[in-house]
Amino acid sequence: TQWSSSAASDVYKRQGMRYGEPSLGEALKKMKENNVSKIIVLPLYPQSGSPTTSTTYDEISNILKNWTWVPDLVFVSGYHDNQDYINALAKTIKQSFKNNGMPDKILFSYHGMPKRYLENGDPYYCFCHKTTRLVAEKLKLNKEKFDMSFQSRFGTEEWLKPYTDDMLLDYGKNKIKNIHVISPGFSVDCLETLE
C-alpha cells in the first residue's frame, strides 16, 4: 500500500544498523523516548534469509526482552517479488540501457552466503532466482541475455554458485566485453556494489 504524503510525514522514522551506527538499540531507544506505540521493522534485504533478516529480528528481540515498554511490532520479511520493487529495478535498468546502450550480457549479482543455508532449507537462493526472473520478464530479456551469480564470499566454506568473479572471468575468455552488472540484493549502493 502507498501512503499519502501527509500520512508519511506523521510517521516517526529511524534507521538502525545491524553492524554499524546508529545501532538498532539506539534507534529503538529514540522511538521509546518519542512514545512510539507501533514499530514497523523493514530490513533492507529484498531477498530475506536467515543470516540477514532473521538476525535483525533476533537482535531486536534481544534488545526488547529486558524492556518493560514493548511496542506493537510488525516485521516485513522481504520484498523479493513485490511489484513496486520489480518495477523500480526495471525502470533503473532501462535508464541504464538508454544512457549506456544495450550490453552483450546482463549479470544479476547477489550477495552470497554459505551453501549450507540452502541445503538446510533457507529460501534466499530461490528468492534471488525469482527476483531475477521477474525483472528479466519485465524487461523482456531472452534467457541468453542474462545470468545470475553470487558475490562477496570469504573463508574456505563452499558458497552459493556461480560466483560473480568466475562469471566475469568466463565472459572475458569468451570475448564478452560489454557487461552490465545489476545488484538487486542491495537496496542502496555500498562498498560491495561500487568496488
Annotate the PLM regions.
Residues 10, 64-70, 138-143:
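Short helix-capping segments at alpha-helix termini
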Residues 14-88:
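Long, hydrophobic, well-ordered secondary-structure blocks that form the structural core
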Residues 23, 47-52, 83, 114-118, ...:
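Short catalytic/ligand-binding loop motif for oxyanion handling, primarily in non-cytosolic enzymes
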Residues 30-49, 57, 157, 161-195:
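Glycine/proline-rich loop-helix segments at beta-alpha junctions forming the active-site rim
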Residues 53-61, 125-133, 195:
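Short, surface-exposed alpha-helical segments at coil->helix boundaries
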Residues 83-104:
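Hydrophobic alpha-helical segments within soluble ligand-binding/sensing domains
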Residues 102, 115-147, 153-162, 167-168, ...:
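Redox- and metal-dependent alpha/beta enzyme cores, enriched for Fe-S-associated oxidoreductases
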